């Protein structure tokens, strides 16, 4: 009877150990056969303790393997396969933007500080600036709430005396600029004339705006006069255009061909080559597509 009971205990212990998952980090329980019913009870309690853990544990943590819990939530973008460079638009860096005070400080100073210097003109310079830059504020006592436009103040600047320009070069605060004034490139470039350059003492790296030449495409105004044979050709084509004997009007391409000159076409082609980045070599796939 005792041996049968022991065999039954061994079988139950073996089945319990098969069902039980023992962690590698946990303590390994060594059981001897002759410990009796107390061992059996303790094994049962451990089985009951660990069973819900294994049932509730997610499948990601089985066998020490870590799997992504969120599958398609965030996907990493692949590298670009084509080796062509990414062309970014050019960034225009102004010379002294780092030292300029914030607009809120400008507003507070223009409202609170006492005004001196130019009472008649409506432009006044504040007494002290930490950055050494000047801005115009409104003379509230004399001119009310009227803001002078940018161009008038720009026109007045060269008429001032040179000492005044050197000491207090008046500039327009960004609050008084409207969209019309900012659209004019020349007036915007006049804003930075009185500001000191950041790189003092070194070789000046940054070009000033007002020294720069602006390219303006004025619509072929400076085209040289045509050769006499061309002029006669043009007159002949215009006379053809005016008289309608056949009754059928000419095609659009013929009408356009009259007014286009070879010189202008060459000029425009050079302009395109100079200002646009056109890669010389095509990629292999593009060559295969076009051939």
UniProtKB/Swiss-Prot annotation:
Keyword Endoplasmic reticulum included in the entry's annotation: no
Key words of the record: Phosphoprotein
GO cellular component: nucleus
GO BP of this protein: cellular response to hydrogen peroxide
UniProt biased composition (Polar residues): 95-113, 127-139
A Pfam family annotated for this UniProt entry: DUF776
Name recorded for this polypeptide: Oxidative stress-responsive serine-rich protein 1
Source organism: Rattus norvegicus
Lineage, top ranks: Eukaryota, Metazoa, Chordata, Craniata, Vertebrata
């Amino acid at each position: 009877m005792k041996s049968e009971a022991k065999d039954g205990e061994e079988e139950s212990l073996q089945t319990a150990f098969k069902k039980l998952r023992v962690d590698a980090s946990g303590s390994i329980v060594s059981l001897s056969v002759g410990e009796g019913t107390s061992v059996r009870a303790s094994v049962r309690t451990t089985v009951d303790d660990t069973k819900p853990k294994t049932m509730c544990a997610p499948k990601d943590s089985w066998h020490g393997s870590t799997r992504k819990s969120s599958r398609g939530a965030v996907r990493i973008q692949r590298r670009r396969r084509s080796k062509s460079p990414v062309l970014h638009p050019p960034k225009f860096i102004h010379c002294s933007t780092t030292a300029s005070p914030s607009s809120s400080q400008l507003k507070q100073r223009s409202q609170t500080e006492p005004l001196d210097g130019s009472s008649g003109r409506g432009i006044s310079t504040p007494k002290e600036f930490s950055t050494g830059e000047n801005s115009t504020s409104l003379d509230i006592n004399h001119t009310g709430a009227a803001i002078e436009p940018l161009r008038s103040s720009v026109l007045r600047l060269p008429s001032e005396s040179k000492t005044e320009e050197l000491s207090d070069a008046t500039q327009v605060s960004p609050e008084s600029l409207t969209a019309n004034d900012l659209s004019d490139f020349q007036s915007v470039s006049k804003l930075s004339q009185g500001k000191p350059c950041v790189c003092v003492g070194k070789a000046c790296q940054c070009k000033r705006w007002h020294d720069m030449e602006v390219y303006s495409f004025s619509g072929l105004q400076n085209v040289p006069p045509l050769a006499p044979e061309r002029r006669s050709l043009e007159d002949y084509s215009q006379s053809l255009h005016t008289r309608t004997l056949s009754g059928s009007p000419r095609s659009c391409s013929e009408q356009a061909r009259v007014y286009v000159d070879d010189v202008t076409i060459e000029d425009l082609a050079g302009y395109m080559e100079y200002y646009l980045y056109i890669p010389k070599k095509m990629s292999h796939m593009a060559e295969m597509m076009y051939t």
